[in-house]
Amino acid sequence: MPNLYEKYVLPRLIDAACSQPPMSKLRSRYVSQARGEVLEIGIGSGLNLAHYGAGVTSITGVDPAAELTVKAAERADALSVPVSVLGISGEALDLDNNSFDTIVCTWTLCSIPNPYRAVAEMYRVLKPGGQMIFVEH
């Protein structure tokens, strides 16, 4: 169970730090390239949601941090495409093989204990000919 800092302070700090103009510029540049059915690994507070373009038909976001995904669900309400947020890790995606056209992962691999497993899972659920969009530091 998260302590008070993890539940209330840390999510706000992460959201504030990750919404700074340089990061928003990169989000806009890369996330806007997504198309079709999208899987976002590490949706967090949903900062990428505003940057998806008209070619996106649905978004499934995964993140094990429930404290962050509350804000993502709020931001999803402003979109015209269906968005579902799942409280699962990118290392163990309970999703069908070959089910997404685009996978987006921004500033997330560094926080996943086994990034190799997460990338293997992403590849498993990516449709043939699909694209992966990574932004990392």
Where are these regions (language model features)?
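A short SAM/SAH-binding and catalytic strip from SAM-dependent methyltransferases
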Residues: 101-114
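Conserved alpha-helix/loop element of class I SAM-dependent methyltransferases that forms part
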Residues: 17-37, 47-48
